[in-house]
Amino acid sequence: MEFVVSLFAFVVSCFILLKVAKNSKNPKRNTNLELPPGPKQLPIIGNLHQLGGGLAHHVLRNLGKQYGPLMHLKIGELSTIVVSSTEIAKEVFKTHDIHFSNRPSHILVFKIVSYDYKDIVLSQYGKYWRELRKVCNLELLSPNRVQSFRSIREDAVLNMMKSISSNDGKVVNLSEMILSLIYGITARAAFGVWSKKHEEFIRLESEIQRLATTFVLADMFPSIKFLGALSGLRYKVEKVHKKVDDILEGILKEHRRQNNNMTEENGKKDLVDVLLNIQKNGDMETPFTDQHIKAIIFDMFSAGTLTSTIAVDWAMAEMMKNPSVLKRAQDEVRNVYNGIGNVDESKLDELKYLQAVIKETLRIHPGTPIVHRETREECEINGYRIPAKARVMVNAWAISRDPNYWPEPDIFKPERFLGSEVDFKGTHFEYIPFGAGRRICPGISYAIANVQLPLAQLLYHFEWKLPGGMKPEELDMTEILGTAAQRKENLLLIPNSHSCSSLKQV
């Protein structure tokens, strides 16, 4: 906190004249409508000092209770709108969706790693994004494409089960194993193979994730261009990203070489192959260079792995904390796959209670607790003026714990989803773990596929205990926020093979 305060003091002392001069040149806006209510602002830093008292989604929920579900903050020089209710979320994601269809720009780390916003997640709304969204829906992340990776998932999950089985009765770090599993599945889906080179890529991607959690003053004051270089962060990110780029460049060259000797019949397509074919065939009307391809592949790892990893980890932790939920989920999986000895994807649709466990996990622990947008133009919501180019933070975490929609919202209760029509596809605005509207996450099917099978296998093959005689209520569920909301501590558990498991014979 002292570091942040000192930086604020630096900003106040060095740039106050610049800010005054800049603001004096701004044209007057339409003042017929007021901005949404919000706390008082300090000169220069605005409300930035009020966001340092805990996790952002917790702090914003508490502020929303004071100032309402539609709130205005000034974060540095950024006009910021905070949404904390189902009703306002519907206004943002449905009624005024086109006005809120941009992603925040001028974010130092993301600008570098996305090759200047050439990816899916961060590209600005327009023709390129619409074409890219179509490619995602029809090619990259279509149900057929996700299904084509079934054998990759089944092989990878089975190998993890064997590894756990070899440590029967011993403490295993399940969090690390899940992370390695999801990264491995994504690497094989994207690149076709798994190698030491890809392990280095994943290590570098994790380092970028760490750097992305750094407090960046330049992001709060984008008009002051040299702040990014001042902290040294730009140099660190560019150095790591150069190594990432070298690896991706090598992967593209290798795929091009292999594709010259490959016919449709003698090899399956991975995601790099799909993107190279789109480029080669000129399927995009907008420019589609190697940088665009590399940005999209990086998206798959940065966005595609964390959501699934965190969901599996939280689900197992919640079941360990709630033994009755664990037993019911295990009984269901073992009944559906009775006599088979292993779990594949053929009957996952029959696991209704496990699906409810996953939905409840995403409700109480959304991987992305705050959904970020940026307004394309000024609009009006509930009689308030929403400025153009404003940052928008939709607090999905607070919305999914609203007692007006969720009885006993802080209790983990999968039964609430049994027989319920509420799902995570963006049409129920009280439940938006993947966002909603036209910028909803395009990889929902891919993410859920990587959650269901690992959980089903873990429940089927093993009985689970907490180490050291720990009681369920003693399990640490402390949350930390990096680029996603995850558990602070790794999940350490003791597996014991169940009699129904055939792992010893596999």
UniProtKB/Swiss-Prot annotation:
It catalyses: (-)-tabersonine + reduced [NADPH--hemoprotein reductase] + O2 = lochnericine + oxidized [NADPH--hemoprotein reductase] + H2O + H(+). One of its GO terms (biological process) is indole alkaloid biosynthetic process. Its main location: endoplasmic reticulum. InterPro entries: Cyt_P450, Cyt_P450_CS, Cyt_P450_E_grp-I, Cyt_P450_sf. Pathway: Alkaloid biosynthesis. It is found in: Endoplasmic reticulum membrane. It comes from the Eukaryota. Its EC number is 1.14.14.-. It is a single-pass membrane protein. Glycans are attached at N173, N261. Heme binds at C441. The chain crosses the membrane at residues 1-21. Disruption phenotype: Decreased lochnericine production, but increased tabersonine accumulation. Pfam families: p450. Mainly expressed in roots. Its cofactor is heme. GO terms for molecular function: heme binding; iron ion binding; monooxygenase activity; oxidoreductase activity, acting on paired donors, with incorporation or reduction of molecular oxygen. The keyword Membrane applies. One of its GO terms (cellular component) is endoplasmic reticulum membrane. Keywords: Alkaloid metabolism, Endoplasmic reticulum, Glycoprotein, Heme, Iron, Membrane, Metal-binding, Monooxygenase, Oxidoreductase, Transmembrane, Transmembrane helix. It is an enzyme of class 1 (oxidoreductase). Component of the monoterpenoid indole alkaloids (MIAs, e.g. echitovenine, tabersonine, lochnericine, 19-hydroxytabersonine and horhammericine) biosynthetic pathway; MIAs are used in cancer treatment and other medical applications. Cytochrome P450 catalyzing the conversion of tabersonine to lochnericine. Belongs to the cytochrome P450 family. This is Tabersonine 6,7-epoxidase isoform 1. It comes from Catharanthus roseus (Madagascar periwinkle).
